[in-house]
């Protein structure tokens, strides 16, 4: 069986490093062409023992292209790289925002898709110390990936699916539309999930102000998150009901913590506004937001 020829554009960035490292670990299956323009990032690629190629060399050879560049640069950079593709190439971006916003350059003779990692879940059987220590995925932790075919050939997309599963070390590749992936991220895991989790982390700070040791607050919070998440999502056998007092507390939290109309985040026009603001935060019609600034909590 011949090897799959894969080009990774941005191979020295965060996602480019993770994906190229995993594909490079399967030399019997993949012929890898790493492209990196930033000097320091290029040095990191070579330090891992991988060869660097020009974009022209890589795209002339590649069957599948992994476009590991920042979301905010996809519009600009895809306009440069997509015209260089060979007919029949599969082109994968790693986030749906630019596709949903129609900022990704396309070609009729190529196949385009999205592949985004789910990250290792505490509901999966993370059965080794390495798996349990892997927070991002691809380094021992069991995770899945979500994918969409924006346009193109089914056979090429099947090749892209296999490549995505290998580069993320994913157990499953769940295929859906790009819009559905966008409702997963940003809507589900960032607009709601990350916001709530950020508030929980800030609440640990408040617990410490009350004299509660951080270790106790974190253990108490994370244990309850595991228990309640498992229960509410149907992964706790028998789905035992929470206490009446907890039900009252949830009702109070809905009034004191969440906006009454928070489920509007699942409306199409809200998603469009959110994606536009995330890709173009300085645009005149972007939603004005106050960024979180707690120095104890890292924000990329």
Predicted regions and their residues:
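NAD(P)-dependent Rossmann-like dehydrogenase/reductase catalytic/cofactor-binding core
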Residues: 212-300
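NAD(P)+-binding Rossmann beta1-loop-alpha1 motif at the extreme N-terminus of oxidoreductases
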Residues: 1-49
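C-terminal alpha-helical interaction appendages
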Residues: 194-208, 227-233
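A short glycine-threonine-serine/GTX helix/turn-capping micro-motif
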Residues: 185-194
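Rossmann-fold dinucleotide-binding core
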Residues: 94-185
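Rossmann-fold NAD(P) dinucleotide-binding segment
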Residues: 56-106
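Short acidic-hydrophobic, aromatic-tinged amphipathic segments that line or gate anion-handling sites
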Residues: 51-56, 175
């Amino acid at each position: 069986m011949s090897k799959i020829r894969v080009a990774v554009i941005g191979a020295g960035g965060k996602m480019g490093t993770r994906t190229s490292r995993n594909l490079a670990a399967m030399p019997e299956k993949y012929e890898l062409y790493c492209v990196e323009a930033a000097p320091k990032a290029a040095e990191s690629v070579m330090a891992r023992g991988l060869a660097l190629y020009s974009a022209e060399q890589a795209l002339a050879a590649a069957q599948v292209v992994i476009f590991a560049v920042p979301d905010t640069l996809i519009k600009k950079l895809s306009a440069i790289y997509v015209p260089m593709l060979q007919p029949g190439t599969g082109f994968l971006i790693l986030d749906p925002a630019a596709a949903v916003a129609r900022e990704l350059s396309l070609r009729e003779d190529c196949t385009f898709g999205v592949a985004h990692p789910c990250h290792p879940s505490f509901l999966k059987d993370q059965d080794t110390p390495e798996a349990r220590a892997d927070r991002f995925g691809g380094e021992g932790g069991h995770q899945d990936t979500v994918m969409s075919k924006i346009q193109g050939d089914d056979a090429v997309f099947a090749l892209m699916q296999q490549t995505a599963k290998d580069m993320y070390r994913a157990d499953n590749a769940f295929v859906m539309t790009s819009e559905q992936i966008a409702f997963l991220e940003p809507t589900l895991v960032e607009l709601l999930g990350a916001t709530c989790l950020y508030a929980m982390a800030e609440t640990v700070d408040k617990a410490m102000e009350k004299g509660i040791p951080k270790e106790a607050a974190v253990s108490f919070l994370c244990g309850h998150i595991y228990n309640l998440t498992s229960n509410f999502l149907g992964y706790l056998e028998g789905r035992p009901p929470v206490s009446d007092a907890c039900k009252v507390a949830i009702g109070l939290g809905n009034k004191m913590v969440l906006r009454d109309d928070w489920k509007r985040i699942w409306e199409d026009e809200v998603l469009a506004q959110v994606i536009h603001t995330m890709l173009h935060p300085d645009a005149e019609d972007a939603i004005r937001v106050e960024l979180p600034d707690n120095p104890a909590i890292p924000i990329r």
